[in-house]
């Protein structure tokens, strides 16, 4: 390879570090949008990837090279079975952070939930929760999705929290109280044509080398000892390998949001 006048940009992005396995098959939502609305609404839904497809469309963006031409892209089909609202959780904030104050569960839970946990029916749970609404800062719906309703053979359900925004705490609790023990469909959460953020876990690939994992360049075919390896691990000082050096490790099974 000839001499370069300028150095080449690094191969592989550092924006997704650490590239480790996700802790769960369920995506973790750390921040929910702040919706300014008079009526409360759920902000999330769950689905399963069903298939991939090709989408042919006409480019309607003006001042682009492909304006008026046909574009072919990839699309993903997501099946969204009904989501059961099995509980309500209230959080309160203090100087140390956010803590769970109460949990209210529906009386008749799906039998598949016994694979995860068991709850005792508490008739006064709703009354006690209503009395403590003054110290509640956030309310979440405890939702469950049964894979069998999506045509999957998995018996273990997925249980997660969905944020509720809009109105005050009293309106949000009344909204969740009305949905408790019922099923919610996706058209009750999202409208047709809206843009949403999708968080999911990618397909796991196992342990991969630096060539595949980071996309670094291979060495010449007659190089000593190795070809699909790095030429250097860094400078002699400091006497450590920096985190930015591409190394072998886990590839896939990461959480990504689009």
Where are these regions (language model features)?
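Extended basic (Lys/Arg/His-rich) segments that typically form rRNA-contacting surfaces
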Residues: 1-258
